[in-house]
Structure formats: structure tokens, C-alpha cells
Amino acid sequence: MEEKRRDSAGTLAFAGSSGDSPASEPMPAPRRRGGGLKRKANALGGSNFFSSAPSKRMLTREKAMLASFSPVHNGPLTRARQAPSIMPSAADGVKSEVLNVAVGADGEKPKEEEERNKAIREWEALEAKIEADFEAIRSRDSNVHVVPNHCGWFSWEKIHPLEERSLPSFFNGKLEGRTSEVYREIRNWIMGKFHSNPNIQIELKDLTELEVGDSEAKQEVMEFLDYWGLINFHPFPPTDTGSTASDHDDLGDKESLLNSLYRFQVDEACPPLVHKPRFTAQATPSGLFPDPMAADELLKQEGPAVEYHCNSCSADCSRKRYHCPKQADFDLCTECFNSGKFSSDMSSSDFILMEPAEAPGVGSGKWTDQETLLLLEALEIFKENWNEIAEHVATKTKAQCMLHFLQMPIEDAFLDQIDYKDPISKDTTDLAVSKDDNSVLKDAPEEAENKKRVDEDETMKEVPEPEDGNEEKVSQESSKPGDASEETNEMEAEQKTPKLETAIEERCKDEADENIALKALTEAFEDVGHSSTPEASFSFADLGNPVMGLAAFLVRLAGSDVATASARASIKSLHSNSGMLLATRHCYILEDPPDNKKDPTKSKSCSADAEGNDDNSHKDDQPEEKSKKAEEVSLNSDDREMPDTDTGKETQDSVSEEKQPGSRTENSTTKLDAVQEKRSSKPVTTDNSEKPVDIICPSQDKCSGKELQEPLKDGNKLSSENKDASQSTVSQSAADASQPEASRDVEMKDTLQSEKDPEDVVKTVGEKVQLAKEEGANDVLSTPDKSVSQQPIGSASAPENGTAGGNPNIEGKKEKDICEGTKDKYNIEKLKRAAISAISAAAVKAKNLAKQEEDQIRQLSGSLIEKQLHKLEAKLSIFNEAESLTMRVREQLERSRQRLYHERAQIIAARLGVPPSMSSKASLPTNRIAANFANVAQRPPMGMAFPRPPMPRPPGFPVPGSFVAATTMTGSSDPSPGSDNVSSV
């Protein structure tokens, strides 16, 4: 039976294995392993006598378990001890899966580590860059004018709305001596003085050299600039490290007001900037920040409070009284008020309760409306008598009344609100004008055309008729004013072009900054979870947490990594003793003022010298110059109607005539060569324009050197007296540069025609100026060198007509190109610096506030623990008192107990007839009797027989004398009836 079972089990095992793995069917090895497995299974389950043969499912489960978990053994690895390999596919699958998981984990782990290491390296590089920038700032020369980042609004040429709001007296037009021009001149003078030497400390006495404005205006402007750190800002640490403590104290007293921005007060926050500060009441520049200790010291100097007496009973009611505002100096004490001891025309509602503070200055924090009304009433009655005013208010001291009156916003706030409307409206109009370029372009040509028309009328009246003998001379000189007119128009166009380019650049800059800021704002609102629509406006007040929304906007604007690194670096700077490191980290170099602001006298002197030389050399040629100018205008008006082919043909003829001998003198040729060499060797640069030469003036022959640069600077400053002289100078220089020569017949014809039709000439000049303004200076000056030398008459008109007809969108393309060129130049570096400074300041402020909160929490915790200790001590003292009381009661009870024991012993001794011991009353007996055995008789001493009980005696029988004597010897004070009472009990 046993063998059949084994064979059947082996057959079943072999069948199961063959069904799972067909490849192992012809091999005989699985039978032996199956049998061995069966024997092992029987050995494991041998304890169960009622178990049947193992099924196929159980065998498969056991084989899988053996395949996945190798058996633990100590013997040799034989075939009998090996795990059955009937399921190789399952074992291989498990092994391959484990290997794949291990390889996958090993593959992901290096990637994560690599990314982490990369982030760490980038962070270290960013911190190293910030520290390098900081070290560069620290090692910078102190002669460089640096300002804090929050002064990025400052501009040498413009007035910011912040300046208009802070100093409204210069912009509201209410004071004659205070205008925007006066403010700009004072500001630029002070800034220029400090910019030239940043190591100095500008004070009020240094402003005596300035002749513009009064002393108060100078002081206001200086303190405003000092407050913002534009002057007297020295962020660089001192080089001498061995200074003493006294030197540091002196330096701290003389520090600029700006350093207070980087120090955070514990008691109160930094107050906002006062719009109209009282500069006369400030002894030092630090007076802009109110000193909280001044009021306390002022209050400490106050004398005792005023005493008040009741009008009814004359009692002292200074502590608590009832005051009647209807009648002066009428006060009642509490008892009289409750008793109703006041006049018949008064009621209890007419009185107010007055309870002064315990000490001076305690009640200065809050002022009720009634107290404020009393203060104003007292000011009207007593004027400047503050003792009477304090007595009238009754609840405040004199110092408190004075301080409250100084802090009251009486009318300054309302005046400031009125003043703010004018600058805002002015800004809106300025923005509208700057954005509307067409209106600017229309107004400028009209003024130029009107001015030109007056000059042309005067010129046409003074033109003399040429004689027959001088026809050749007039024809030769008539070519010179043509070029002069052309150069004059080009000069006027160049003067207007920088204004157009400046307006376009500013608009492009504003658009670029606005787009980046709006993008950062949109992303910040999305990060906070606020769904924004194109129609809705962004407002931090709509957010659930406006503070976090603002922080997200600043981080988006500056960059998360840069903002975090800068905040950490600023927090690390808190370990220093002052805010010097913070000030040094957040500052930048202020750009130099424009050249025309630096040395305006130089250009004026140069132009004056040039005008003087021209007047001396051409004093006798002014009538001829005027006639030449009229002839040139007529030639230009005729050539505008000529086609391009005729112009080219005429140009060739004029060039051929020039090449003939005798057409031009050797002197003029030598002068022309010298002028050309001078122009080719010295490129033209303009001070007012920031564009390179190839943008403003692509043709060098078009732009003369000194002759054109000086009229460009001082063209608007020429007086009416020297105007003709300057025009003659320009025409003479242009005539030297012009080579061609017009024929005599054409010139005479054009001259006569210009005399006949002066209105057409003026109209043509106006159209030319209009086209020059609309198309820009680049189109006016874009004529090549050859056309300049070959076309003295039609060179300017032909390109203008062609440009106006062929490129109608030239202005839009030019504006687009300038926008693309200025986007890289006018980036948002200042905006990013401001955002970084704001985030760093917020981080430092939060760190300081966190420290203050921690200190306050620690202080409150300490006070709480101290209070608990006081309570515990109070409880322990109560327990000690209770314990002492208990001990006293216990001692008293113990004494009572001892007395009772003694009395009991005496009673027992008296009953037994034994003389009591001679011990003291408080001493215990020799043999104490337990309390539980009260009726047990006392044993007699050793050697004595137990006494017999007394014999009953008749009532009248006398007591033996021995007993009486024994009783007397004990010295007991108890009477005999007492013993009878005890015995009876």
C-alpha cells in the first residue's frame, strides 16, 4: 500500500510537472525529485494521520516557494538538498524581475543624484556671483557716486511724480519764487556738487554759493535728496579698523539719515514720509524720523498734576471728579454729585466724569473726542497759555496737550490732496503729448514755417537787381546760397530728430517694461490661485492673501533663484553691527549728468567766438548774402518740378563745365581738398544724441565737423541780432564744400522767377520742412556722397520726393527698428534691482520681526513661569501655615491627652489607696495603660501584695485616717466630691 501511494504521488507530480514544462517530459530526473519531494511533504505532514495525498495545487505552491526561497542548511550542497528545478521558467522570471528592478533603481538613483548635484553647483555659482558683486562694490573707489537701489526713479533731465508729491510747493504754482525750473536747477546743482566729490558731506552752509531760490527752498530740496540717499550717502565701510569706541560713537551721531532705513526699530514701525515736514523745528537731518524718547523725556520733566476742589464742599477731588463743560471751573466730587448738590439749571447729564492718569504720560496714548473738543476750545480761549489749556482739559497734562496739538492733522493733509491733483493732471497731459507723435510733428513744422516765412519776406525785400557787368560774378556766387539753404534745412531736421527718437525710445522702453511686469503679475496671480480674465484688472486687494501675492510678483519679476540667494545674503549681513553691509549690497553707480548740463558755458563761448569771427570777415558781404539766399530758394523751388532724368543731365553738364579750365580758380580747388580731407579724418559726433554716427549721420560729407556741430547745439539760442551773421557763416562753409557751378542763363532766369513769385517760394520751403520732419533725419541725410558733389540744387528734393512717394510706411518701420534696438538697451535691470531690494528688505524685516516675536514669546513665557512660581509659592505658604496650625493643634491635643492620663492615674490611685508618684504633672506614669484597656487595674510594684478591695461600710462610718493622709500627701487639688463623681461615673 505504501509503495502504491508513492508511485501514485510520483506519477501525479510527474504529470503536473510535465503539464507545466513540456521540455522536461523525456527526462527521468523529475520522478526522483518528485518522489523526494513527496517524502519530504509526508515527513512534514506526518503528524496528521487523516491527511490525504498532496494535490497538484499544493505541490505547485510548495515548488514555487522552494524556488523563490532557497533552503537554509549547514551541510554540503548535494542533489538531494537542492531545490527542485521542475519550474525553471518561474525561477528565471523572478530572478530577472529582481534584476530589472535593481538595475532600474540603480539607473534612477544616479540621475537624481546628478540633478541634485547640478542644482547644488548652480546655487553655489549664483551665491559666488552675488558675493563677487558685493566684493566688487566693497572694493570700489569711494570717489564713485553710488545711490541706493530705491533711487532708480531719479533722472538728471526729468522730474519724477514722486518729487512733485513730496515737494508740492514747487509745482502747484501758488508761490512765485518756487517753480519747477527753480527746483530742477537747485536739485541739479546740489547733485552735481556731490557728484563731483562723493566724499564730502553737503550741509546747509554749502548752499550759499547757489544764487537760485531762497534758503528755505534750498533746505527743503537738500533734505529731500538727503532723505532718499541721493546725496551724503557713504555706504563704503571705513578702511581704518583700529578706531576707538568714541570714534564709532561720533561716527554714529554723524551718519546719514539713509542708514536708518536699514535699521529696524523695536517699539514702532518706520513712519511714512511726511509731505510737508516742519524743517525749521528739526535741528539735525535725522529729524525726519520722530524720536520716541523725546516725548517721554518731555513728559518726565512735567511737574505735579493740577489739584481740583469741589465747588460744593471744597474737598479735594483731583482723583475723581465730575466736570460741567457748560460752566467754567465747576467741579463736583463724587458724594456731592450723587447727592445732587448742583444748581437748578443743571442736570446730571451735563457733567462728565474726569479720572486723570496715575502718572504723567500714561493717558497720552488715547484722546477722546470730548478731550479733543476741550483742547480746541481752550486754544480759542487761552491762546498760547498751556497751563490754562491743560487745566481746562483737566485730564491731560501740559506736555500731553502740546504733543497732541502738534500731532493733529489740521489742514495740511487737505491742502496736500488739493496739490496732488495738479501734478497728476500734468503727468497725464505730458503722457498724452509724448504718445501722440503726429501732433508733435504737426506743431513743430508750423512754427518753423512761420519763422521761415518772415525771414524770406525780409530777404525778398532787400534783394538788389544785378548789373550787366557783374552778371558773371553773381552767377558764380549764386551756387553758394543753394547749398547753404540745403544745409540749413538739414540742420533744422537734425535738431528735431533727437526729440522724435527720444520720444520713440521712451515709449518702447515703457512698453517693454510694462509687458514684462504684466507677465510677471499674471504669473504671480496664477500661482496664488486667482483666475484672471483679459477684461478684469489685477488688484492685490482681491487676493485672499495680498502679502503673498505681492511676494510672488516680486519673485517672478526678479527670478526665484536670484531672489532667494539675495535674501539669504542679506540675512547673513544681519550679524554685523550696523546696516552698512545692507546699504552696500543694494546700491548702484549713478550715471554722469548729460554733457550739455556739465559745461554749458563752453559751447556758448565757442559759438560766440565763431560768430564774432564771421562778423569780422563778412561784414561787407551781408547784402550779397541775402541776395544769394533768395536766389538759392528760387533755384530749389524750380528744381523740385524737374524730373529725375533732367536733373541727372543737368548735373553732368555742370560737372563738365567745372572741369574746363577757367571755370574755377585754383584757390577754391585747394580749399575744397582741405575741407574733404578734414571731413574724412574727423567723424562727426553730437553730444545731445546717444545714437552712433552711422545712425544719425550715415553720410560724412553731409555732416560738417565743427561748422555743423556748433549750430546744432546753439541753434535755438541764437539771438535775432546775430541771426544773419550765423546764416552767412553756414552758407560760406557750405559754399566751400560745393563743387558744381550753374550756368548764367539758368541762374538769371531762376532769380527773376523767384522775384516774381515769392509766395510759391515760401510754400515750397514749408513743404520741404514738413517732409523733413515727417520722414526723419535719416531720410533727409541719406543722399550718397556722389549726389552731394554732383547735385547742388536738386539733391535734397529728389530723394525726398522719391521717399515720400515710394515708402508711405517709413515712419512705422523706423519706429519698429528703434523699438527693437532699444529693447536690449533699456532692459528692466533697474526694475529687477528694485524687486530684489524689496524682497531682501522684506526678508530682513521678517527676520527681525521673527526675532522680536521670539524674544517677546520668550519674555512672556518667562513671565508666565514666574507667575506660576508665585502661585505655587503662595499655595506652599498656605500649606505651611496649615501645617503649622495642625502642629499647634496636635501639640495642644497631646498636652490635653497627657493631662487626662495624669488625672486618670490619680483617680485610679485614689481608688486603690496607693500614693501616687512624686513625678511632675506632665510626666507619664511608669506603666502606661493602653487606651483599649481602660478598666484594667494598675499592677502594684514588685514586692508588694495586691491590695484587697475596700470593705463596704455603712454611710455614717468615718473614713480611716491613713487614707486621708495618703490623699493629702499626693498634693492633688481636686476636691473630694470630684472623686465621688468620677467613681459614680
UniProtKB/Swiss-Prot annotation:
Residue stretches making up the SANT domain: 362-413
Keyword annotations of the record: Activator, Chromatin regulator, Coiled coil, Developmental protein, DNA-binding, Metal-binding, Nucleus, Transcription, Transcription regulation, Zinc, Zinc-finger
Bias (Polar residues) ranges: 662-671, 725-736, 780-800, 965-985
Chain residue ranges for the region called Disordered: 1-55, 428-502, 591-814, 944-985
Gene Ontology molecular functions: DNA binding; zinc ion binding
Pfam family, one: Myb_DNA-binding
Binding-site residues for Zn(2+), renumbered to this chain: C310, C313, C333, C336
Biased composition (Basic and acidic residues): 428-464, 493-502, 615-661, 703-724, 742-776
Protein name, per record: SWI/SNF complex subunit SWI3D
Source domain of life: Eukaryota
Compartments reported by the entry: Nucleus
GO BP field: chromatin organization; regulation of macromolecule metabolic process; regulation of primary metabolic process
Tissue: Ubiquitously expressed.
Gene null: resulting phenotype: Plants are viable but have alterations in leaf, root and flower development, and are early flowering.
This protein's GO CC annotations: nucleus
